[in-house]
């Protein structure tokens, strides 16, 4: 049974972030409790010393408390219940806080824009992982047992049943993204879902598959619903903005009847005329860029080496649209295993620190508590509890990840590109059965395992040689 987050711990965290009156919002991603704050000067950074807290990330308007997978959701739910009993603030306090919030938005616009991706995609990640694991296990069984694609019987039926979830997810994914994106940008979710469905419909009357829209051009202009996720994100943003403008001038009595109607008509027109072509060009450009980086060993090394820094700044969710674009263009996510090497490099760095530390030191205890999650692809406990506070090991961990990325890039350059079978999934050792390639699942698993091994070894060596000098090993 999952261990609950104690109310004492949450009350202590609440006190150290300035009390209920300093909380602007409460949410979570996969591993972090995210508390929006009005005044960051009231936040005590020593939250990270509390037992049960694996790390803390502070920005100008947000406190991110690292708990780990599963626990973050429970912490956010319990914290929301605590905040439900918070005292109401007076108008002067609210006005002062709004001023501070506005200033914070002006100084962290890029970070807040990228945070939108977390709002859009984080609710979908458990589904990505579940569908990807089922597909990976089914593919592995079919490969090992040599089950033909057209085989009949109980086992083939069971394997097809395990694969159907991935097909369903990716067939209708744009609708889920459209719904979440419209809400994230301040609009109505169902309007975003309807607009996203326009990208899913077919506009070729001669096609024998798909869902025909009923027309093949838009008042004589050709329709080309390319761009998929990129176009849907742009369209959902436009839909939310248009809805806000329409609602501003709509009488209250007509709001429910006409606001969505007018919003959909205007947004759909923009989608057919501008957004679909624009999304297609952006999609092709993004796919070309990252496919060429993926096939360039040095590009892979740079991507893997910098990914831990993206995690620290909380902008790693910005890669998810790229993952989806690569799934559309390649049939697998070739970027994800490259970026996963960052976590493997950190495991090697942590093992080096453990080796160099004193037998009964606090550092060894910290590594023991964080190494298993690290091996399984959950890197935050190692980042915030072990490597980042000591800085040099964090740098050598990045170098270890870069070495793993270089290895995968070299293998792709030599003719065996591989990737994740889903847009998103677990990293670390858990991701092994999710790897796939044109040559099959077993070669892809071997390449990924080789990359992890290279990152472990290089992270260990770099940290032993360069990451332990003048570093606190107690």
From Swiss-Prot:
Keyword Methyltransferase: no
GO MF annotations in UniProt: kinase activity; protein-N(PI)-phosphohistidine-sugar phosphotransferase activity; protein-phosphocysteine-N-acetylmuramate phosphotransferase system transporter activity
Catalytic residues in the record: 29 (phosphocysteine intermediate)
InterPro entries: Glu_permease_IIB, PTrfase_EIIB_Cys, PTS_EIIC, PTS_EIIC_1, PTS_IIB_1, PTS_Sugar-Specific_Components
Entry function: The phosphoenolpyruvate-dependent sugar phosphotransferase system (sugar PTS), a major carbohydrate active transport system, catalyzes the phosphorylation of incoming sugar substrates concomitantly with their translocation across the cell membrane. This system is involved in N-acetylmuramic acid (MurNAc) transport, yielding cytoplasmic MurNAc-6-P. Is also able to take up anhydro-N-acetylmuramic acid (anhMurNAc), but cannot phosphorylate the carbon 6, probably because of the 1,6-anhydro ring.
Domain writeup: The EIIB domain is phosphorylated by phospho-EIIA on a cysteinyl or histidyl residue, depending on the transported sugar. Then, it transfers the phosphoryl group to the sugar substrate concomitantly with the sugar uptake processed by the EIIC domain. The EIIC domain forms the PTS system translocation channel and contains the specific substrate-binding site.
Protein name: PTS system N-acetylmuramic acid-specific EIIBC component
Species this chain originates from: Shigella flexneri
């Amino acid at each position: 049974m999952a261990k609950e987050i104690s109310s004492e711990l949450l009350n202590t965290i609440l006190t150290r972030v300035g009390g209920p009156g300093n909380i602007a919002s409460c949410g979570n991603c996969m591993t972090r409790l995210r508390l929006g704050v009005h005044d960051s000067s009231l936040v005590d950074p020593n939250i990270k010393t509390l037992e049960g807290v694996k790390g803390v990330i502070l920005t100008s308007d947000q406190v991110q408390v690292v708990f780990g997978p599963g626990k973050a959701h429970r912490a956010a739910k319990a914290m929301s219940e605590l905040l439900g009993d918070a005292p109401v603030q007076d108008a002067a306090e609210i006005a002062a806080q709004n001023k501070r919030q506005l200033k914070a938005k002006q100084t962290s616009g890029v970070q807040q824009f990228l945070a939108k991706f977390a709002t859009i995609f984080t609710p979908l990640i458990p589904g990505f992982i579940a569908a990807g694991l089922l597909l990976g296990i089914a593919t592995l069984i079919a490969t090992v047992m040599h089950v033909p694609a057209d085989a009949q019987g109980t086992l083939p039926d069971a394997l097809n049943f395990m694969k159907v979830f991935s097909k369903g997810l990716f067939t209708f994914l744009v609708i889920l993204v459209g719904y979440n994106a419209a809400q994230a940008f301040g609009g109505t979710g169902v309007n975003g879902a309807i607009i996203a469905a326009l990208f899913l419909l077919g506009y070729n009357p001669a096609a024998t598959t798909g869902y025909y829209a009923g027309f093949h051009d838009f008042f004589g202009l050709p329709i080309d619903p390319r761009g998929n996720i990129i176009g849907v994100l742009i369209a959902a943003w436009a839909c939310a903005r248009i809805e806000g403008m329409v609602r501003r001038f709509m009488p209250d009595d007509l709001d429910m009847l006409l606001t969505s109607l007018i919003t959909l008509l205007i947004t759909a027109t923009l989608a057919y005329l501008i957004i679909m072509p624009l999304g297609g060009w952006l999609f092709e450009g993004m796919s070309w860029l990252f496919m060429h980086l993926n096939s360039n060993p040095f590009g892979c090394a740079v991507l893997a080496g910098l990914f831990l820094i993206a995690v620290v700044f909380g902008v790693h969710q910005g890669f998810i649209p790229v993952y989806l674009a690569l799934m559309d263009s390649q049939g697998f996510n070739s970027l994800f295993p490259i970026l996963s090497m960052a976590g493997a490099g950190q495991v090697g760095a942590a093992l080096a620190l453990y080796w160099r530390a004193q037998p009964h030191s606090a550092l060894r205890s910290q590594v023991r508590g964080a190494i298993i999650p690290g091996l399984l692809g959950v890197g935050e406990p190692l980042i915030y509890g072990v490597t980042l506070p000591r800085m040099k090991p964090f740098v050598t961990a990045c170098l270890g990840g870069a070495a793993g990325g270089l290895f995968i890039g070299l293998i792709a350059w030599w003719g065996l590109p591989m990737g994740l079978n889903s847009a998103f999934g677990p990293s670390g050792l858990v991701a092994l059965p999710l790897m796939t390639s044109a040559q099959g699942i077993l070669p892809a698993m071997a390449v990924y395992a080789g990359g992890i091994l290279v990152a472990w070894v290089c992270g260990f060596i770099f940290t032993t040689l360069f990451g332990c000098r003048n570093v606190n090993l107690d």
